[in-house]
Amino acid sequence: MEPAFGEVNQLGGVFVNGRPLPNAIRLRIVELAQLGIRPCDISRQLRVSHGCVSKILARYNETGSILPGAIGGSKPRVTTPTVVKHIRTYKQRDPGIFAWEIRDRLLADGVCDKYNVPSVSSISRILRNKIGNLAQQGHYDSYKQHQPTPQPALPYNHIYSYPSPITAAAAKVPTPPGVPAIPGSVAMPRTWPSSHSVTDILGIRSITDQVSDSSPYHSPKVEEWSSLGRNNFPATAPHAVNGLEKGVLEQEAKYGQAPNGLPAVGSFVSASSMAPYPTPAQVSPYMTYSAAPSGYVAGHGWQHAGSTPLSPHNCDIPASLAFKGMQAAREGSHSVTASAL
C-alpha cells in the first residue's frame, strides 16, 4: 500500500519533501558504490535522484557515517545547572559584576574550559531570564527584613479634636436595649476640617467648635488665640490714619488740583440759582436757516475762540440752504428771535 502523502521524482521514485532518506536506502547506496557501480546507475536502479546519491556517498567518504544531520552533531549544551549555579553565586556576591567578568571567573575557577565555556551573550541571557527575578526577590526580602514593623496609624488630626454637632447629638441619644452600640465615627460621618484651611492656619476655631461649645472636648487653639491681644500688634500713632501721616493727608488736600479743563469738585451750582427750562415755541416745519445763528442756539463757554454757535470747531456753514418746493414757504415764514426761545 502506497503512503497517503509524498511526491514522485523524475525517476518514478516516491519521496517526502523535507524528510531524510530512509537508512535502508542509504545503506544500499553505499553497498552498490563499494561494488563498483557508478552513481548514475545506482540512481536509476534505486529510483533516487542523482544529487541525493552523490551527497550520501560524499558524506560517507568524509565522515564514514550514513546518518542524516549536521556533520559532527550539534554543539553540546554549555548552560548546565552547575554553570547557572556558579553564575548566581557570582551575581549575589557582586551585584555589579559584568558578564565578561563572570566568564573569566568560570575559566579561573575551573568550572568550564575553553571549549564549553558559555559566551558573554549566553551569560547575559542567563542573568536576565533566570537570575534577574531571583535577585529582585532577594533584594525585596532583605528590604522587608530591615524595615521596622509598621506602627498603627493614628487618627487624622489626633492632636486637635473637632467634634461635629451631629456626632455630639448622636452621643447624647441613648441606645435602646438589645441593640449594639455603634461608634460615633461609624454611625455619623465626622466633618474633619482640612489641615490647610484658613481656620487652621490662623488658629481660629471652626464653626463646628463654635456650635458645640457645650461639648466636653477642649481645643488648645482657643487658648492660643485668646493669648494674642492688642498688645502684640504694633501701636498706631494718634496722628496717623491708616498708616499715613495726618500732615501728609492735609497737605495733599490743601494743594489738590483739579484736572485741566474741568471744573473743580467743590464748584457746584445750587438748584435755586438755576432758571427753569424755557418753553419751546411752535416753529413751522418749513422753517429755513436764513436767520442769524445766534437766534437758535445759545453760546457755550467751551467753544473755540474763532467759532460760532453752530460751528464750534471753526467750520464755515453757508448762509442759507435752498430746497425745492420751499421757496414760497421761505417768504411766508417768520423768523424766530432769541427772546422767543
Curated annotation (Swiss-Prot):
Region (RED subdomain): 82-130
PAI subdomain: annotated span: 7-63
GO (cellular component) term, any one: nucleus
Record-given protein name: Paired box protein Pax-9
Mitochondrion found in the keyword field: no
Residue ranges for the DNA-binding region feature of this UniProt entry: 4-130
Subunit structure: Interacts with KDM5B.
Organism, scientific name: Macaca mulatta (Rhesus macaque)
Subcellular location per the Swiss-Prot or TrEMBL entry: Nucleus
One Gene Ontology MF term: DNA-binding transcription factor activity, RNA polymerase II-specific
Major site of localization recorded for this protein: nucleus
Classification of source organism: Eukaryota, Metazoa, Chordata, Craniata, Vertebrata
UniProt KW keywords: Developmental protein, DNA-binding, Nucleus, Paired box, Transcription, Transcription regulation
Function: Transcription factor required for normal development of thymus, parathyroid glands, ultimobranchial bodies, teeth, skeletal elements of skull and larynx as well as distal limbs.
Alphabetical list of Pfam families matching this protein: PAX
InterPro entries (UniProt xref): Homeodomain-like_sf (IPR009057), PAIRED_DNA-bd_dom (IPR043182), Paired_dom (IPR001523), PAX_fam (IPR043565), WH-like_DNA-bd_sf (IPR036388)
GO biological process, one term: regulation of transcription by RNA polymerase II
Keyword Transcription regulation in record: yes
Region described as Interaction with KDM5B: spans on this chain: 168-189
